[in-house]
Amino acid sequence: MGVAIDKCETRPANIEAILSGLDRYNPETTTVFQDYVVQQCEDRTFDCYANLALLKLYQFNPHLLQPETVTNILVKALTVFPSPAFSLCLALLPAYTQPFPSSEAEATAAQMSDFVESVQKLARLSSLLESAQYAQFWSTLNSDDLYADLVADVAGFEELVRIRIAVEVGKAFREVNAEVLEQWLDVRNSEALEKFVTEVCSWEVDKSGSATVVKVPTNKENEARSEVKSERVGVDMFGRVIRRGFEQAA
């Protein structure tokens, strides 16, 4: 069972106090939340509830919006996929930033804004991760210098995403071709892959066959289980059905 979205073990006491009271709607707390986003980027934590509170303040006070803070929040949300965090954050942004503008005016505004371009590029990355197109995610991330600029403030971004991908792979597979896994994790060579899967994931590398295979230990997600359901239907149940049929006919 996942952790509730309003919970965060690393949340400072002053942030907890703001979120628990009416000050969460006070525009003066915007700078406090912004500093907290910077802290999250530096110490590799993520507080979705606090970040949503900041985006809600931006929604009510558009003049306070800081594009860099918003993009940092979105980048941090990428590091906790698969989760609704990115979609929730995206939904609180101005309509003209959305990947699919609903009007010509919004489309025109989107074309003229670097901020909108950044948001939509990050939305593209989120879509690739959520749809498990991991190789395409890395190639897209490496295809444009703007992506490098967007993730620069988030310490360990690639490592955090790589670990999340490994977690998802471990849920779905018992063994994976090493060359395929290299592409999914964006590691440069077989030595780097072997180090990652053995030291970080505690998986095994099998080189005995014609192709190197990475073996994932059995867990409750990837274990093949046959599900057998048995239902007992008594004669009295049939009797009620037949009797009801005659009653309706009458």
UniProtKB/Swiss-Prot annotation:
Keywords: Cytoplasm, Initiation factor, Protein biosynthesis. Coiled coil: none annotated. This is Eukaryotic translation initiation factor 3 subunit K. The lineage of its organism: Eukaryota, Fungi, Dikarya, Ascomycota, Pezizomycotina. The keyword Protein biosynthesis applies. Gene3D superfamilies: ARM repeat, domain 1, Winged helix-like DNA-binding domain superfamily/Winged helix DNA-binding domain. It is found in: Cytoplasm. Component of the eukaryotic translation initiation factor 3 (eIF-3) complex. It comes from the Eukaryota. The keyword Metal-binding does not apply. Component of the eukaryotic translation initiation factor 3 (eIF-3) complex, which is involved in protein synthesis of a specialized repertoire of mRNAs and, together with other initiation factors, stimulates binding of mRNA and methionyl-tRNAi to the 40S ribosome. The eIF-3 complex specifically targets and initiates translation of a subset of mRNAs involved in cell proliferation. One of its GO terms (molecular function) is ribosome binding. InterPro entries: ARM-type_fold, CSN8_PSD8_EIF3K, eIF3k, PCI_dom, Transl_init_fac_sub12_N_euk, WH-like_DNA-bd_sf, WH_DNA-bd_sf. SUPFAM superfamilies: ARM repeat, Winged helix' DNA-binding domain. Residues 46-229 form the PCI domain. Belongs to the eIF-3 subunit K family. GO terms for biological process: formation of cytoplasmic translation initiation complex; regulation of translational initiation. One of its GO terms (cellular component) is eukaryotic 48S preinitiation complex. Its main location: cytoplasm.
